[in-house]
């Protein structure tokens, strides 16, 4: 889910028992906030006196305000539809009732996906005061602008690519340390790193050829970094043409074998190798060592 906030005249659409409901209202709005709220579109209006003179002080305030306003509009229509269709045919899929929609206003934090929340926090730390403006195209699943970044920015590209977004979402609980090769800063998530690249208009020309890899968007500053990435992350995924275009010689990137004879694991990345040794073999309370101790005791 990718929220988007706009200072616009919004067209809020929802569905009730397969019937499309629509309300036009000059409000701040939040894109994709719930189960049945599919699309919001807007275009800036000059001289619209109904718009507030100033933005809320924080991003979460913006989202909460737009959520409450949008729910007020949609819930009214949903309540009318719910009253008129209280008896539905048997087997019809249950729909979200207006009171259930209204009750969701306090769940805003849980509705925002973790990667987007990381970016909100990153923007707040940087003292950002973003305005999120969406285009007037209604048939789209994501906003045209994410946190004030244009559509061609790294952040927007990450969120507009379903395969890349799926890869990021699958690994969102695993936080790493991403080093910027242009400065000394480090970042806990890929999205924060992408926001940093956008902040300084940094473009890295060497892109990963794997379709679902985030680094096809973020790229690398030098070809050696790309080759190292592909050798450690995508061995087995690269076809012959990709290896030729990368000038990749796999033998230059040998695997690291676990030093413990009883363990036969091999690692392509040095950090993964060190983490394995520290957590599995040098940790007396690891599951591996506990099982090994039990086996040795049984053989006595």
UniProtKB/Swiss-Prot annotation:
One of its GO terms (molecular function) is DNA-binding transcription factor activity, RNA polymerase II-specific. GO terms for cellular component: cytoplasm; nucleus. Its main location: nucleus. Pfam families: zf-C2H2. InterPro entries: Znf_C2H2_type. It is found in: Nucleus. Residues 80-100 are annotated as: Disordered. Residues 80-90 have a biased composition (Polar residues). A zinc finger (C2H2-type) spans 178-199, 206-234, 256-281. The keyword Hydrolase does not apply. GO terms for biological process: cell division; G1/S transition of mitotic cell cycle; meiotic cell cycle; negative regulation of meiotic nuclear division; negative regulation of transcription by RNA polymerase II; positive regulation of invasive growth in response to glucose limitation; positive regulation of transcription by RNA polymerase II. Involved in the control of meiosis. Represses the transcription of the IME1 gene thereby inhibiting cells from entering meiosis. But also activates the CLN2 gene thus promoting mitosis. This is Zinc finger protein RME1. It comes from Saccharomyces cerevisiae (strain ATCC 204508 / S288c).
């Amino acid at each position: 889910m990718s929220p988007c906030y706009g200072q616009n005249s919004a067209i809020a659409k929802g569905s009730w028992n397969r019937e499309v409901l629509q309300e036009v209202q000059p409000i701040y709005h939040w894109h994709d906030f719930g189960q049945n709220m599919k699309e919001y579109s807007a275009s800036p209006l000059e001289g619209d006196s109904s718009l507030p003179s100033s933005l809320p002080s924080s991003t979460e305030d913006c989202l909460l305000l737009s959520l409450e306003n949008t729910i007020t509009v949609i819930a009214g229509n949903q309540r009318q539809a719910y009253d008129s269709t209280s008896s539905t045919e048997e087997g019809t899929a249950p729909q979200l009732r207006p009171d259930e929609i209204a009750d969701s206003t306090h769940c805003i934090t849980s509705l925002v996906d973790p990667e987007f929340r990381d970016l909100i926090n990153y923007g707040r730390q940087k003292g950002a005061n973003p305005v999120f403006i969406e285009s007037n195209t209604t048939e789209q699943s994501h906003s045209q602008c994410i946190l004030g970044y244009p559509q061609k920015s790294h952040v927007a590209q990450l969120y507009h690519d379903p395969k890349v977004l799926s890869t990021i979402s699958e690994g969102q609980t695993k936080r790493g340390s991403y080093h910027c090769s242009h400065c000394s800063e480090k970042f806990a998530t890929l999205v924060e790193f992408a926001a940093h690249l956008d902040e300084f208009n940094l473009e890295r020309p060497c892109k990963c050829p794997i379709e679902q890899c985030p680094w096809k968007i973020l790229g690398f500053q030098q070809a050696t970094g790309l080759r190292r990435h592909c050798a450690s992350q995508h061995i087995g995924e690269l076809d012959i043409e990709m290896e030729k275009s990368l000038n990749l010689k796999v033998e230059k990137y040998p695997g690291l074998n676990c030093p413990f004879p009883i363990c036969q694991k091999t690692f392509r990345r040095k950090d993964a190798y060190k983490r394995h040794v520290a957590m599995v073999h040098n940790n007396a309370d690891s599951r591996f060592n506990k099982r090994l101790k039990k086996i040795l005791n049984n053989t006595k």
